[in-house]
Amino acid sequence: KKAQLLAILSGLQPRKDNQRPSENKLAIQYGQVDASLLGQYEASVSYQNSKEITITLKTDNHSYIGTPLLDKDARVMETERGETLYKGKRKVNGLEISEWWNKQHDNYSSEPAINYNFELVIHEDKKGGNKLLELSMDYSIDLLHADNALTEHELVALWENITGTIKYHPTQW
């Protein structure tokens, strides 16, 4: 284990924050590491902005393929008090993506809220060595303090803006 860790640490290289990783490198904040040194991995990064929108990116390099997003049970995706806003496939920059957007009403807790969840998956089948990408966006509206909350229309526009920037390069996202 120590030798593995030292190999990974020796493979770390500096990188500007807005610079794409080179070759088969996995990006980390202000750095990159050779993905082949990691063996089998699953990586995720979450970001929350000042409006409390959480964006999460996930990828992995293992061969396990789970239930495709659009084949998942609606009761699981929507939960008991939820509804689907959109479920389907579309093309973005030549990539076929699967998406499921939903909204849940939580009126039964001490802090009633509306929770939005947007999910996107690319290369679910992992065919041809393509790397899986999962992207999600979550947002909650506290109904007791909803004065400056984003509207559903604004959230959809933001999601479409974000997903419209996705481009695939065979060795990197």
List each model region and its residues.
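Charge-rich, low-complexity N-terminal segments
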Residues: 2-69
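Signature of long, low-cysteine stretches enriched in small and polar/charged residues
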Residues: 49-129
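Acidic-enriched, low-complexity/disordered segments with a strong bias for Aspartate over Glutamate
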Residues: 17-18, 34, 60, 71-73, ...
